[in-house]
Regions:
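Short, Lys/Arg-enriched N-terminal segments with co-localized hydrophobic residues
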Residues: 28-40
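Glycine-rich phosphate/pyrophosphate-binding loop and the adjoining helix
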Residues: 41-48, 178-225
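N-terminal beta1-alpha1 ligand-phosphate binding loop
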Residues: 42-74
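Short hydrophobic segments within beta-strands
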Residues: 50-51, 80, 152
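A generic structural motif
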Residues: 72-78, 177
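N-terminal beta-loop-helix "entrance" segment that forms/cooperates
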Residues: 82-98
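Helix-loop-strand module that forms the ligand-binding subsite of alpha/beta enzymes
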Residues: 95-176
């Protein structure tokens, strides 16, 4: 039987060479599967996260950093800082500033979105609403369209930012985004669960963040089918 060749990142290999192992990103992985199964190996899902706060000691930035530590192995999380995005001006929606162009490009390139939001005046903070307005405009050029999304929130109060989350969900209807519904991550009394260095120290909170990420990954895979 003539050996079959298979083109990989490591070069042109025969099926005999591929049978015991395949090189992926510098790591050698062993498989007891056929060549076609190797060819269909799932790529790592990408998640873009951002927090609706500019504050240096933000609790929501802290839960986002915790998410980066807890993301499942089959996914990666990149955090985008909203610092520097100017107030939305519809006069410039077709020629936005460079930071907005980068933000929209990151959104389009990612598989899923993770938002961490404070609650201001029973609703979404201006920083987050402003970023969403830029990224979804002009009409017909909505970077968020079709994206799976998960929400986290943290506050020093009892409700943990619940009202901001529900207002965000209203926006998702128009933005044509697909939110994860469970579990809900609403970190109440955040000062007791996040230390002075900005690390989430409450194990139950870390567990729920991990579960939310697992749900987001599963939901993203399902939507891709």
């Amino acid at each position: 039987m003539t050996p079959t060749s298979f083109n990989t990142d490591a070069g042109l290999l025969t099926n005999e060479q591929l049978l015991p192992k395949v090189i992926v990103g510098g790591d050698v992985l062993s498989f007891n599967v056929g060549i076609m199964e190797r060819a269909n190996m799932e790529k790592q899902l990408s998640i873009l996260g951002f927090a609706g706060s500019l504050r240096k000691g933000s609790y929501n930035k802290a839960v986002l950093r915790a998410a980066a530590e807890l993301v499942p192995n089959e996914a990666s999380l990149e955090i985008f800082d909203l610092e520097g995005i100017p107030p939305f001006n519809q006069d410039f929606e077709k020629t936005p500033p460079d930071i907005v162009k980068r933000f929209k490009s990151k959104i389009r390139a990612t598989d899923a979105i993770l938002i961490a939001t404070p609650e201001h005046n029973y609703s979404v903070p201006g920083v987050l609403k402003n970023a969403i307005d830029w990224a979804s405009r002009p009409y017909g050029d909505n970077s968020f369209e079709g994206k799976p999304v998960a929400i986290m929130s943290a506050s020093t109060g009892m409700l943990g930012g619940a009202r901001a989350q529900y207002h965000l969900r209203q926006m998702f209807v128009f933005l044509d985004m697909h939110p994860v519904n469970h579990p809900e991550v609403m970190v109440n009394f955040a000062a007791q669960k996040i230390d002075e260095q900005g690390k989430v120290i409450d194990e139950e909170t870390r567990k729920r963040i991990r579960q939310l990420l697992e749900s987001l990954v599963a939901w993203t895979k399902k939507l891709k089918q």
